[in-house]
Amino acid sequence: MERLIEKLLYSSRWIMAPIYLGLSLLLLALGIKFFQEIFHLLPNIFTIKEVDLILVALSLIDVSLVGGLIVMVMFSGYENFVSKLDVDESEDKLGWLGKLDTSSLKNKVSASIVAISSIHLLKVFMNTENIESDKIKWYLLLHITFVVSAFAMGYLDKITKK
């Protein structure tokens, strides 16, 4: 009975595989949104104000960072929790593939969240005349929370490895 339960528990990790596959669909949706922004920008490129162009650029950078975060979670999550990715050794193989354990993934995810939050906060600061000051304070507080959390997780990781 114990062996059966253990086999079932171990096999249940495959339930995560469709979730990681679903993240690739989310990545596709992000790519579509990215190019939608580009196509909206191009007809107005000669008339758009510099501040608005920078805001669009920051939005596109934000999408790019989120996409990278999705790729990182998708690949390393699959490798850590489901099965080893059997990708042939080639020039285009990701250097970190197979090397991210859950602890380093957690640190990279928190660093990515801080970077995404920083970009978002920069967009807010560039558009302060259209945003209420209370909202700006909340954005700033949330960003500080992300930064402190990332440092705390890194510190806890460091002291647990000693």
UniProtKB/Swiss-Prot annotation:
Family from the record: Belongs to the UPF0114 family.
Any Pfam family: UPF0114
Membrane topology: Multi-pass membrane protein
CC per GO annotation: plasma membrane
Matches recorded under PANTHER family: UPF0114 PROTEIN YQHA (PTHR38596:SF1)
Keyword Zinc: no
Predominant location category: membrane
This protein's UniProt keywords: Cell membrane, Membrane, Transmembrane, Transmembrane helix
Positions of disulphide bridges: none
Record's protein name: UPF0114 protein VC_0208
Record keyword Transcription present: no
Subcellular location, record wording: Cell membrane
Transmembrane intervals: 10-32, 53-75, 109-126, 139-156
